[in-house]
Regions:
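N-terminal secretory signal peptides
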Residues: 1-12, 22-26, 39
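C-terminal regulatory/interaction regions
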Residues: 17, 296-361
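Zn-dependent metallo-beta-lactamase
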Residues: 20-97
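Conserved beta-strand hairpin/beta-sheet module of binuclear metal-dependent hydrolase folds
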Residues: 71-118, 207-210, 215-220
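Active-site neighborhood of phospho(di)ester-bond hydrolases with catalytic His/Asp-centered motifs
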Residues: 102-104, 130-137, 155-157, 217-219, ...
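Active-site HxH/HxHxD metal-binding segment of metal-dependent hydrolases
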Residues: 117-186
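Metallo-beta-lactamase
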Residues: 158-204, 211-212, 242-245, 252
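Divalent-metal (often Zn2+) His-rich catalytic cores of metallo-beta-lactamase-fold enzymes
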Residues: 242-306
C-alpha cells in the first residue's frame, strides 16, 4: 500500500471510530435495565490494551496497492471491472446504454463513482449508473446505494426487498425489480444472470454470473486468500453457507468477485476454502468423540452454563488447534478467526446434523 493510500485508509478508519463512539454515546442502553449500569471505578481512565501478535499475512493473500483516494479499479475481462478499498469489493459493467453496478459498499462510497468516471473517461463511454444489483440486503455491501439517486433501477431478490422495507434505511432503497429464483438482466447489449439457490450467508444472498466475462460474483462466502471472519462471515444459515461453494463451482467461470478483501479470486481459492471448512468439520467430529464433558459439569455443579461454556470451549480449542497449525501461512488470519469459526461449525454439527446428541435412556 502506498503512503497516501495508507493515509486514506487511516482517515476512513478514524471517521468510522468517531462515528461509532458518537452513536454509542447517544444510546441510553442502561436505561432499559433496572437501575442502570454502574460506572467503572475509573471511568475517565482507559488503559492501553495489550494486543496479541498474529502470523504475517501471506503475500499471495494481498491485493494491489490503492491509489491516493483509497481505491483500486481494474478490468476483470473486457468491459467488466472491479473496485476495492482493500476490504470490500464492488463490480461494474460498462455498456452502450450506461453502467451496471453490482453492490455499493459503504466503505467504498463516493469512490465507486470516481472509479467509474476513471474507466469511462479512459474508454470514452457513459459514466451514468443505470442499474444497481444487490447481492443481498446487508448495509456493508449496499450502504452507498442512495448515492446513485432515485432514477437508478435497483434489482434484487424478493426477500431483499422485504428485508430492506423492514429495515427502512434511507441509504439502501429497496429494489423495484425483484425475482424469486432466476433473472437475466439485459442492458446495453450485455447480459448478467442472477440466481437464488437457497439461504446461505443470508436468506437473500444471490449468485451473480457474468457468462460472457468468465466471472462469478458471490458475496460473503469465500474470502479469497483469507479465512472467514467471525462465525463463517456472520452467516445465518451454516449448512447453506457450507454448501454454497459447491454451487459456485458448478458455474463456468475463471474470475471470482467475493465482496471482500483486496484481490480477485480463482477456482483454486474456492477449493482451498472448501478444504479448510471440511477440515474444521472433521476435526469437530473428532473433538466431540474425544473430549469428556464430565469434569466440566462436575466442577461447576449447579452452574450449568459454566459447565456448558468450559466444555464447548475445550471441544472448540481441541478441534481448532490442528486446523490452525495446517493453514497458518496458507490462508491469511487463520490464527485470528479459526477458533470462532470452529465454534459455529461445531454447533451446526450438533444442532443441524445431530452429531453428538444423546437421547436419555
Amino acid at each position: 500500500m502506498t503512503p497516501s493510500a495508507s493515509r486514506a485508509s487511516a482517515t476512513s478508519r478514524r471517521s468510522f471510530l468517531t462515528g461509532t463512539a458518537a452513536v454509542m454515546g447517544a444510546s441510553s442502553i442502561a436505561a432499559v435495565l433496572p437501575g442502570g449500569l454502574a460506572e467503572p471505578a475509573s471511568a475517565g481512565a482507559v488503559s492501553t490494551p495489550t494486543l496479541p501478535d498474529y502470523a504475517p499475512v501471506p503475500p499471495s493473500s494481498l491485493g494491489p496497492a490503492l491509489n491516493d483516494q483509497g481505491y483500486y479499479v481494474a478490468r476483470v475481462k473486457r468491459n467488466l471491472y472491479w473496485v476495492t478499498d482493500g476490504t470490500y469489493q464492488s463490480a461494474f459493467l460498462t455498456t452502450r446504454a450506461g453502467v451496471l453496478l453490482f453492490d455499493a459498499p459503504a466503505t467504498i462510497g463516493h469512490n465507486l463513482q470516481r472509479a467509474i468516471n476513471e474507466i469511462a473517461a479512459a474508454n470514452g463511454v457513459s459514466n451514468t449508473v443505470t442499474h444497481l444489483v444487490y447481492s443481498h440486503h446487508h448495509a456493508d455491501h449496499a450502504g452507498a446505494s442512495s448515492l446513485f439517486g432515485k432514477d437508478v433501477v435497483r434489482i434484487g431478490h424478493e426477500e431483499t426487498r422485504r428485508l430492506l422495507l423492514r429495515d427502512n434505511d434511507p441509504t439502501r432503497p429497496a429494489p423495484t425489480v425483484t425475482f424469486a429464483d432466476r433473472y437475466t438482466l439485459h442492458s446495453g447489449g450485455e447480459r448478467v444472470q442472477l440466481a437464488w439457490h437457497g439461504s446461505n450467508h443470508t436468506p437473500d444472498n444471490i449468485y451473480i454470473h457474468f457468462p460472457d466475462h468468465d466471472t462469478l460474483m458471490l458475496v460473503d462466502i469465500v474470502n479469497s486468500g483469507w479465512v472467514p471472519i467471525y462465525n463463517l462471515n456472520l452467516s445465518e444459515d451454516v449448512p447453506g453457507y457450507i454448501a454454497a461453494p459447491t454451487t459456485a463451482l458448478s458455474y463456468p467461470w475463471k474470475h471470482f468477485i467475493s465482496g471482500h478483501v483486496g484481490r480477485l479470486g480463482t477456482r483454486n481459492d474456492v477449493h482451498l476454502h472448501q478444504q479448510y471448512v471440511a477440515d474444521i468439520a472433521a476435526s469437530c467430529k473428532t473433538a466431540l468423540a474425544t473430549v469428556d464433558p464430565t469434569p466440566y459439569f462436575v466442577n461447576y455443579g449447579a452452574n450449568q452454563w459454566a459447565g456448558v461454556k468450559t466444555y464447548l470451549d475445550a471441544v472448540t480449542d481441541y478441534a481448532a488447534a490442528p486446523v490452525i497449525a495446517k493453514y497458518t501461512g496458507v490462508l491469511a488470519a487463520t490464527d485470528v478467526f479459526t477458533t470462532s469459526t470452529t465454534l459455529v461449525v461445531l454447533e451446526s454439527i450438533r444442532l443441524d446434523l445431530g452429531v453428538g446428541s444423546q437421547v436419555h435412556p
